[in-house]
Curated annotation (Swiss-Prot):
Pfam families: KH_2 (PF07650), Ribosomal_S3_C (PF00189)
Biased composition (Basic and acidic residues): 233-242
Protein name, per record: Small ribosomal subunit protein uS3
Presence of keyword RNA-binding: yes
Family label: Belongs to the universal ribosomal protein uS3 family.
GO-annotated molecular function: mRNA binding; rRNA binding; structural constituent of ribosome
Function according to Swiss-Prot or TrEMBL: Binds the lower part of the 30S subunit head. Binds mRNA in the 70S ribosome, positioning it for translation.
Annotated GO CC locations: cytosolic small ribosomal subunit
Organism, as annotated: Trichodesmium erythraeum (strain IMS101)
Domain of life: Bacteria
GO biological process annotation, one example: translation
Listed InterPro entries: KH_dom-like_a/b, KH_dom_type_2, KH_sf_prok-type, Ribosomal_S3_C_sf, Ribosomal_uS3_bac-typ, Ribosomal_uS3_C, Ribosomal_uS3_CS
Quaternary structure and partners: Part of the 30S ribosomal subunit. Forms a tight complex with proteins S10 and S14.
Amino acid sequence: MGQKIHPTGFRLGITQEHRSRWYADPKNYPDTLQEDHKIRQYVKATLANAGISQIRVERKAEQIDLEVRTARPGVVVGRGGAGIDSLRVGLQKLLGSNRQIRINVVEVTKVDTDAMLIGEYIAQQLEKRVSFRRVVRQAITRAQKAGVEGIKIQVSGRVNGAEIARTEVTREGSVPLHTLRANIDYAYCTAKTIYGILGIKIWVFKGEIIPGQEEIANAKVNQPKRRQQKRRQQYDDRSNEG
């Protein structure tokens, strides 16, 4: 039932990594989980125009490490790091504690292959009342030029202001939802139009990840090269030839 389950949760530990890394006592677990949710909501609301792809949270004792993956690192960092400082102060006020918060900004180099950034682009265009089919076709074309093996986009709601809500699905290439080793990037976002809210889902297939293949390739690269012994060239003795 590959279409019934969240593609990221289905592949955690196989091709996807956990986006929150910490351990907590059972009595503190709900509060810590809610803190993660508040942190992500605050960062996305504060940096709405920064093209946020992922926010990863890691906790160590009294320290919180945030990894913000963005398409516009300059907007997040700000002039002289002022953006990060204001974000850190805002998070400390939100959490109501003086815990140390470290923020690491990572740039997303391939914007056209990131599912969340593709979804945000489609949502922004739909909110500007651009034609649905034109926006989806542009997003698919850009993703294919960037080298993805397959992409699937689903838009649900009153598409183009229709009286009756419907679901439009567009797919190009291969998107194997049942294959666990398939590296599928999934995202969901909403577009708030004058006709109502549209739900946008994006699946991006970036190829298969075979366990051990990368390790074998790296071992071959790092293996020291043996020097080949040069063979002596044999010369014919032609000194007695007239």
